[in-house]
């Protein structure tokens, strides 16, 4: 299978249909990381679409094409944090009207195993800096170097934050299957790919 760099070079030469390969490769990673920040599956999917469109429009300026996955993850995190800030501002404007359904995302309603729900709740309750490092390193299996680059942290900070996240989650995570957390289903993958491919 061709590398990201080879695919990007062909896309830049006009083979736009190859962008679908990159999206399908990174969809699950982006969804999990987006969910760890925004905790709303519809909004996470919308952020993914925005991320893919922005990345496509800037492909020609990407110098390190072999680092596409890391670059894409940075775009997603920035967009997710921006949306999260907007949500906080909206909540402050509607002070006094507590959003009791905040944790009732469509994704959580669909999950039928108590273990998955327990894991998602535990991960979502982590402080943001620990949650991001945990999702990237343990669920997405991103390297320490990639995590350092995306989050602009030193190697020791990545390791310390991961260790603290594990300590906080130890009881809930013992013997679980992390890949089942924030599961990204095939129909959602197809929806995002089709949306972006129709826009480019």
Language model feature labels by segment:
Residues 60-63, 74-94, 112:
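Arg/Lys-rich amphipathic alpha helix in sigma70-family domain 2
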Residues 42, 124, 128-132, 137-157:
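Helix-turn-helix DNA-binding module
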Residues 32, 46-53, 66-78:
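Structural recognition of an alpha-helix C-terminal capping motif at a helix-to-coil junction
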Residues 1-4, 89-112:
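Internal acidic/polar
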Residues 77, 81, 151-175:
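DNA-recognition helix of helix-turn-helix
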Residues 167-200:
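C-terminal edge and immediately downstream basic/flexible tail or linker adjoining helix-turn-helix-like DNA-binding
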Residues 2, 8-30:
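A short, charge-rich alpha-helical start-of-domain segment used by transcription regulators
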Residues 12-13, 49-67, 86-88, 99:
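Sigma70-family region 2
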């Amino acid at each position: 299978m061709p590398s990201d760099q080879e695919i990007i070079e062909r896309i830049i030469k006009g083979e736009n249909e190859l962008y679908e390969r990159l999206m399908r490769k990174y969809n699950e990673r982006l969804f999990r990381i987006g969910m760890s920040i925004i905790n709303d599956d519809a909004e996470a999917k919308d952020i993914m679409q925005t991320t893919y469109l922005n990345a496509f429009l800037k492909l020609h300026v990407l110098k390190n094409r072999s680092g596409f996955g890391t670059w894409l993850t940075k775009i997603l995190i920035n967009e997710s944090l921006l949306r999260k800030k907007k949500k906080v501002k909206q909540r402050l404007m509607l002070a006094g009207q507590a959003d009791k359904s905040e944790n009732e995302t469509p994704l959580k309603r669909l999950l039928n195993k108590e273990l998955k729900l327990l894991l998602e709740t535990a991960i979502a309750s982590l402080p943001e800096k620990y949650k991001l490092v945990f999702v990237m390193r343990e669920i997405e299996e991103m390297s320490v170097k990639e995590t350092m680059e995306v989050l602009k942290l030193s190697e020791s900070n990545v390791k310390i934050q991961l260790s603290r996240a594990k300590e906080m989650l130890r009881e809930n995570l013992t013997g679980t299957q992390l890949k089942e957390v924030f599961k990204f289903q095939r129909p959602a993958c197809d929806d995002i790919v089709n949306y972006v491919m129709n826009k480019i």
